[in-house]
Amino acid sequence: MHQETILNYLKEIKPYYEKKGFIIEGLFGSYARDEATEKSDIDILIEIKKNTSDIYAKKSALKKDLEAYFQKKVDIARRKYLTPLAKDVIKDDLIHV
């Protein structure tokens, strides 16, 4: 799996998920750093718009869609819940879409 493949797909689906209240911010972690191995998961940073309903179900659907497309484990991090340390680490890796 190549970084470009992931970024292109995230850009493609971003408008669809924004209509559902999810803002796909970008890719971080080993794929963003070009250090991924076969065992690496894909790390995606999102935020959720205020007044979005059914957040858990929609987030689960997003994760399921991404894992089906990429055939890899996907971790979805929500900016709102990141610790200051995690935010600091991610800011250096994050590739915005």
Q: How would you describe each model-predicted region?
A:
Residues 1-24, 32-38, 49-97:
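Catalytic core of pol beta-like nucleotidyltransferases
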Residues 27:
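Conserved histidines in hydrophobic membrane contexts and catalytic metal-binding motifs
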